[in-house]
Structure formats: structure tokens, C-alpha cells
């Protein structure tokens, strides 16, 4: 899919069902998210509304169909860190490695820069040995986008009767 066919726009609460459909397989079949329970449609609508009050919540469309989304939120809940944001991104599983994630992050970084954000962080589930629940593709994506490893939390996630590490990746914009 050529990247020029991808349209980026702000998410609305009307997008919640589609975004939830993208997110659900990540909850059910991967350790990419530590959510164990799929949020309700109303919870997802509320998330879009709450995030959008202070940060961008973006969707990527191709021919009117949403293929992925990303949003930013406060990284540390202290005033001295208000120039920092944490990133989250989810792309429809069949549309990974198509440019959707790159376009979402490029637009997000541009908007956050204009908003006065200076530091971006991504907390990514990590495994020393890839398995059916987790590869390190998210880490590789972030590194391609210019993020560098800034921290490592050991065995901080439990899902599918296993423990997973989380690494913190950072990018100064």
C-alpha cells in the first residue's frame, strides 16, 4: 500500500467500534498490551474523549477504512514533566509494515512538537525469546522511528501464564 493513499485525521467517538475491533486481537492474542479484558465500547469512546482533551488521538484511513490509530498521553503526572508524552499505536494486524504506523507517528510527532512536547516515550513489551504472544517487532518499529532504549523493567507484566519485560524507548523531538 503506497503511503500517499493513507489519510490521517483526528479520531472521533464514532470511530470507537472500529478502533476497538483493531485493539481486540492485541488483548486476546498478544502480550503487546497488558490489558487482559477487552474494554467496552463505552469505555473506548470515553478514552477517545478523555485523551483528545489534551493530546492528539489519530486514525489512519485508506479508502475510508480505518487501518490503525495512535494517541499520546501524559507520561509523568507532575508539572515539571508536562513537556513529555507517552505514545501508543495499534495497526490492524493485516496492515502492519504498510506505512500506516510511520504515517501515524510522523503526523503525531508534528502535532506534539507544535503543542510544546519535547520528549516522547513508548513503553513496549519485550521478550528475550520471541513466542506466539510476542515478537519484538514493536521495538524494531520504534527504533526505525528514531527511538532509543532508555530503560528496562523486568518481569513486570503477567499474561498467558508468563511474565514479560517492558522496555522504555525515548525520542527527543
Name each model-derived stretch.
Residues 7-19:
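A short beta-loop-alpha structural element at the N-terminal edge
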Residues 20-47:
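Conserved GNAT-fold acetyl-CoA-binding loop/helix
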Residues 38-94, 105-106, 111, 172-173:
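Acetyl-CoA-dependent GNAT
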Residues 97-113, 136-140:
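Conserved acetyl-CoA-binding loop-helix of GNAT-fold acetyltransferases
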Residues 112-134:
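Conserved GNAT acetyl-CoA-binding A-motif
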Residues 123-125, 139, 143-162:
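Conserved catalytic-core motifs of GNAT/GCN5-like acyltransferases
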Residues 135, 155-173:
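C-terminal "cap" of GNAT-fold acetyltransferases
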Amino acid at each position: 500500500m503506497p503511503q500517499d493513499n493513507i489519510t490521517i485525521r483526528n479520531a472521533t467517538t464514532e470511530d470507537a467500534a472500529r478502533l476497538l475491533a483493531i485493539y481486540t486481537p492485541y488483548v486476546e492474542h498478544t502480550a503487546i498490551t497488558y490489558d487482559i479484558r477487552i474494554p467496552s465500547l463505552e469505555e473506548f469512546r470515553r478514552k477517545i474523549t478523555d485523551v483528545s482533551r489534551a493530546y492528539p488521538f489519530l486514525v489512519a484511513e485508506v479508502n475510508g477504512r480505518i487501518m490503525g490509530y495512535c494517541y499520546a498521553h501524559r507520561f509523568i503526572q507532575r508539572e515539571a514533566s508536562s513537556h513529555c508524552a507517552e505514545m501508543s499505536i495499534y495497526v490492524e494486524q493485516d496492515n502492519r509494515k504498510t506505512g500506516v504506523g510511520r504515517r501515524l507517528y510522523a503526523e503525531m510527532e508534528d502535532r506534539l512538537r507544535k503543542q510544546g512536547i519535547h520528549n516522547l516515550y513508548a513503553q513496549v513489551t519485550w521478550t528475550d525469546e520471541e513466542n506466539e504472544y510476542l515478537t519484538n517487532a514493536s521495538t524494531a518499529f520504534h527504533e526505525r522511528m528514531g527511538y532509543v532504549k532508555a530503560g528496562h523493567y523486568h518481569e513486570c507484566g503477567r499474561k498467558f501464564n508468563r511474565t514479560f519485560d517492558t522496555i522504555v524507548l525515548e525520542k527527543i523531538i
